[in-house]
């Protein structure tokens, strides 16, 4: 965590490093890599002390400790108008990508399953040129 420092961290099946961002609210995911669809699925995130802003084509990253199955969480979010997709699951935590830009205090997310939850960043959705 140095000024202007950026970390690029991979999504690995046995690590919920992204859950630690709930305890480090100044650190945010601001990019999901690769950014181009033709390069394959997103497998890493860029993290820094930045304020993320909407771009018009965003995905928001949200964490929950809910013991419910991912499908049940997706259904609960969907009932509240939030489109979600499971990104990773490890250490009792689940990481979801939410279609659109959501603020940390969004009431729809406050109603979502889990006692330890939160937005940990946002990034543009994948695109192709």
Language-model features: locations:
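Domain-level signature for soluble enzymes in the chorismate/prephenate branch of the shikimate pathway
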Residues: 1-129
